[in-house]
Amino acid sequence: YKGNVGSGDKARIFVCLTNMTKPGCTYHTVNTKSSEIDKTVLDPTQEFLYTNLNDPSTLEGHIIGYGDLLIEQSQSSWKQVDIQIHYRDKYASEKPNVLILTASASYRGDYFEGSTDSNLYLDDIEFIYE
């Protein structure tokens, strides 16, 4: 990656390996334009994914593992990083059926808490697994 981290801001890259168990569900939507944002937010540290966190009947699936990288300093030249995936032991035998990758130049920009000077570029993303 490379990019500029504006004043008071951070960039973020995270990845979730998920098992979507709701029939036909192949993605997770976060509605950043809604006043209900906290009900749809994707938090990789949480075990389950819901369309609405306040409604258990909206369960979409569970997170098998996740990795997270917060970037707090600007990087003018390309930098290679490895993001380790932290797996939940109880799902060790499962294979994920959906990969969620999120990259944001301003990781709290959806809350208007960032900098308009931030930018983030990604290149040559590679997943290595056994």
Task: List the model feature ranges, each with a label.
Residues 75-77, 91-95, 105-129:
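Extracellular carbohydrate recognition
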Residues 7-14, 120:
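Short coil-to-beta strand junction motifs in C2/discoidin
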Residues 97-101:
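Cysteine-clustered segments with highest specificity for TGF-beta superfamily mature ligands
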Residues 2-9, 21-24:
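Extended, low-complexity, turn-rich repeat/linker tracts enriched in Gly/Pro/Ser/Thr and Asp/Glu
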Residues 24-95, 115:
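Extracellular carbohydrate recognition and processing domains
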Residues 2, 12-16, 80-86, 102, ...:
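One-face residue pattern on beta-strands with alternating periodicity enriched for small/polar residues
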Residues 16-20, 128:
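Predominantly extracellular/luminal cell-surface or secreted proteins
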Residues 8-10, 93-96:
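Extended extracellular/luminal ectodomain segments enriched in beta-structured repeat modules
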